[in-house]
């Protein structure tokens, strides 16, 4: 029941699934150089995040949630995460898509009746941002970006009692958008095939929302593309109807980049 309550709290403020933003990488041992031809990349990735958060109303705490990566994984029904990027010269455009479907069913005896609660949370997050290369050299690339992040979340909880033959359903929907700006890039480690990808952004949007994300890690180039492992953090705060919601997601993300 404790995990169910934690998941119900997550339903109030977006939960789960996260947005990891893998860095653009090259098949060579140095940062990709600028060209006047269109270049594309597709990066599927996975993020094993833990979730901590709190919710308060008029400065009075209404509850907290703390889910380990194992908790999130055990409740995960379906997930899809990818980045698609296009680049021509110094100009670029990327799309980061995340979909998560979490569900949990618990039961508890209330008197002589057995009460079951089934919670399902679906969340889609999209980031679309044009970017411009500020610095480009054989070993270092720095891109500036300005774009938007959108999030759609639907939570449904169904209470049922087989003994009493009664069912009740509650659902909520949340849609929020934010303008984000930030930097991303990579350092190549000498003449080796290893590099350091990095990313940071911050933005504001609807319902007095604030969001930020940052990651730092290590990657390696191969003939077919790149593999990266990063430590990733995403933070959200928004204030609908005098209610303050804080959500922090942190964990390791692994990504594979394919270029064409």
Predicted regions and their residues:
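Residues on the lipid-exposed face of transmembrane beta-strands in outer-membrane beta-barrel proteins
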Residues: 42-44, 82-88, 128-132, 146-148, ...
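Short loop/turn motifs that connect adjacent beta-strands in outer-membrane beta-barrel proteins
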Residues: 28-38, 135-142, 189-194, 223-224
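Solvent-exposed loop/turn segments connecting transmembrane beta-strands
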Residues: 74, 138, 201-213
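Residues that define the transmembrane beta-barrel architecture of outer-membrane proteins
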Residues: 36-38, 76-80, 122-126, 140, ...
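Predominantly the C-terminal beta-signal and adjacent terminal strand-loop region
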Residues: 209-210, 214-260
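Transmembrane beta-barrel strands of outer-membrane/channel proteins
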Residues: 42-48, 86, 95-99, 144-150, ...
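Extracellular/periplasm-exposed beta-strand and loop segments of Gram-negative cell-envelope proteins
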Residues: 51-77, 97-125, 151-176, 205, ...
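Short glycine/proline- and aromatic-enriched beta-strand/turn motifs that initiate or cap beta-hairpins
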Residues: 21-96
């Amino acid at each position: 029941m404790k995990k169910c309550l934690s998941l119900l709290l997550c339903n109030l403020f977006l939960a789960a699934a996260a947005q990891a933003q893998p860095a653009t990488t090259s098949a060579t041992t140095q940062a990709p150089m600028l060209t006047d031809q269109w270049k594309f990349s597709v990066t599927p990735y996975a993020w094993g995040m833990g979730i901590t958060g709190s919710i308060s109303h008029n400065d009075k705490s209404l509850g907290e949630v703390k889910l380990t990566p194992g908790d999130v994984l055990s409740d995960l029904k379906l997930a899809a995460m990818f980045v698609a990027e296009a680049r021509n010269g110094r100009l670029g455009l990327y799309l980061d898509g995340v979909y998560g479907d979490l569900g949990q069913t618990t039961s508890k005896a209330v008197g002589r009746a057995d009460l079951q609660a089934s919670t399902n949370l679906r969340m889609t997050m999209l980031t679309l941002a044009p970017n411009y290369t500020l610095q480009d050299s054989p070993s270092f690339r720095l891109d500036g970006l300005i774009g938007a992040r959108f999030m759609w979340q639907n939570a449904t909880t169904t209470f049922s009692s087989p003994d009493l033959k009664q069912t009740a359903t509650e659902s909520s929907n949340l849609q929020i958008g934010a303008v984000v700006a930030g930097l991303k890039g990579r350092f190549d480690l000498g003449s080796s095939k290893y590099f350091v990808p990095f990313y940071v952004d911050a933005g504001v949007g609807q319902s007095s929302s604030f969001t930020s994300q940052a990651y730092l890690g290590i990657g390696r180039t191969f003939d077919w593309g790149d593999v990266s492992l990063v430590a990733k953090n995403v933070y959200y705060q928004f204030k609908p109807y005098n209610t303050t919601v804080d959500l922090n997601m942190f964990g390791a993300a692994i990504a594979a980049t394919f270029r064409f």
